Amino acid sequence: MWMLVMFDLPVKTKSQRNLANKYRHTLLDMGFDRLQLSVYCKYYINGNATGRDLFQLQIQVPPGGAVRIMKATDSQWAATIRYLGPQRKNIEEPPDALDVF
């Protein structure tokens, strides 16, 4: 199971930028990989394990922030198309079970 986190956070003031950067660092600390500036993903061996992370992500959303979270199965993730420039690239493979721990 993959979890995709997409967000739009206010960054007009210095304190808003600090909170937005803190949210990005929180995602990285939780094991998410950055796909784009405001798009992160994480692989879960067990879909039930997402609950704890969902709660942490919810309580960390800065005021005025908009966050959308999508869960995708391995087959849904494998069906995505990825480009780097005009070149089509392979998508990320799920990590080996031992790599997750």
Model-derived segments and spans:
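Basic nucleic-acid-binding interfaces
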Residues: 1-4, 9-101
